[in-house]
Amino acid sequence: MDTVLHNKPQYLLTKVIEEATEISQAATKSLTFGINNHNPLTPNKSNADDIINEFYHLDAMIEMLQQEGILPKLTKEEELKIKNEKKRKVNNYMKGYGVS
């Protein structure tokens, strides 16, 4: 196998970048073509499906990094705190700019 990545942390972090980029690409396609539209080559899979699938691919890579001890594992409470804080900030931003 030809690769310049010789250790697990490098490889897994590269996969995180790859999956995050694929989420970005799926979201961009949703904005361009519609969230419920699909790639002509995959008519049974919508752009919304692509976003969700790529999110869970990224989640799997984060989980592997946690299992390897490269990233810290969070409790469910810590996860919820981070998520809820982000939601609060985004909702406040949208409200401040009249986004409905």
Question: What is each residue range found by the language model?
Answer:
Residues 1-100:
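Flexible "arm" and connector segments at domain edges
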